Amino acid sequence: FRNIPISVTMISNYLEVSTKKQLKHLFYGNYNRETNEGLIIDLINQYENSKIASSLMAFDQFLKISDTYLYNLNDNKINNLMKGISQFNHMLDYCEFDSCVHSISQIYNFCQSILKEKDKYILLTPYLKSIQKKLSNIYIEKNDAIKKIKFIKLLLAHNSLQIAITFTDQLIREELVHYYYFPDSKSFKEELLNKIAKESDFYDLSTDLLFFLNIRNSSKNINSKDYIVNIRNKNNNLSKDVSLLDKENINIFYIKIRNVVNHGGKIDQNIDVNKIILKCLDSVEKFIKEG
């Protein structure tokens, strides 16, 4: 990229951002005084590769890319990868837990497809390999719930704290409902709730179990709805050992982290949020594997 002056690259970026249009050509003239000849070449491919490399580096570091650039390239493999990452970011923004985990596998496969022709993508190879390495333990995991645990740990490693809090809450609730009501199912699936009752609500069911199983400390303000109690009494299928769950840290997670964030509060600076979430996740993993 040394043939492209930095100022030209900056101006090109500015034009794309401000006009929301994609450059089709980037002509560069190279005059040779000795031969008195000038050569004009189109450096659009090099310019686009520099954008792609920057985006891959950003994703590798922050699990985010900017949607500012329009990726409408002639290379289908690169197109698929960039669109896959963009879709992942959209799912993350909207807290689509299952879709995010599924998207991780797609991104891994897109990287793999490009790396099969690594000689063609020499400048992108280091970023692709780094991304693949980062996602590999999620990709190879067979258990859906453990995949989610590993994904939350990845979010924590990249300082995506708020979404990690949301997904940790969802994971705990899913696995309680899963093993209390549907222990024969390989994983939690929301459509299974219809088998209990059409009016059943995942949030109410899971909140009821958190207190009924003494995972969270009981409160005078918590009273399960009658229909939830009836559903619970008719469907007591729990075969897991609840004592494997780290009740102390799960309580701290809900009272001092999750509930505070949900109500727009400020978490106490003395609370080690990452440490507490990791302890919760490790105990849920133990509950799944050993319970």
Predicted regions and their residues:
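Long, low-complexity, Lys/Arg-enriched
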Residues: N3-G291
